[in-house]
Amino acid sequence: MQGRLSAWLAKHKLAHRPLGFDYQGTETLQIKAEDWVSIAVALYVYGFNYLRSQCAYDVAPGGSLASVYHLTKINDNADQPEEVCIKVFVPREDPRIPSVLRIWKGANFQERESYDMLGIFYESHPCLKRILMPESWIGWPLRKDYIAPDFYEIQDSH
């Protein structure tokens, strides 16, 4: 079933794939990485002015990685703001997604966390570096094929 936003994107010839609705009725769309920035700008113009959250996950061992964006349309008189969930899937061999930091400033630390934990490279992010793990950490801890080191010494900063 095609939702209202999917119909709007189709009307404007913006490439996407409807994935259905969640239990709260939030429409979920799949967007290709190469189309993400142009669609993100269109969504912002459409009124999705708030990035509620961004996260990422490993779909399956050896499979693709996904970056998930929850966007909300906030205005002065909205009791129940419209929301949409966007999923961008990328291959684990070269996981690159354009950053949307210039559109939604709230993407800054969230994209950095996804980079730190899963190794998704957010192109044109001005400060894409580890945020939770030490800079010397090797690998991406939340990938399903990650092998944890037997021992890792964290240096005391005092």
Curated annotation (Swiss-Prot):
One of its GO terms (molecular function) is NADH dehydrogenase (ubiquinone) activity. One of its GO terms (cellular component) is chloroplast thylakoid membrane. It is an enzyme of class 7 (translocase). GO terms for biological process: photosynthesis, light reaction. InterPro entries: NADH_DH_suC, NADH_quin_OxRdtase_su_C/D-like, NADH_UbQ_OxRdtase_30kDa_su, NADH_UbQ_OxRdtase_CS. It comes from the Eukaryota. Belongs to the complex I 30 kDa subunit family. NDH shuttles electrons from NAD(P)H:plastoquinone, via FMN and iron-sulfur (Fe-S) centers, to quinones in the photosynthetic chain and possibly in a chloroplast respiratory chain. The immediate electron acceptor for the enzyme in this species is believed to be plastoquinone. Couples the redox reaction to proton translocation, and thus conserves the redox energy in a proton gradient. This is NAD(P)H-quinone oxidoreductase subunit J, chloroplastic. It comes from Cryptomeria japonica (Japanese cedar). The gene is ndhJ.
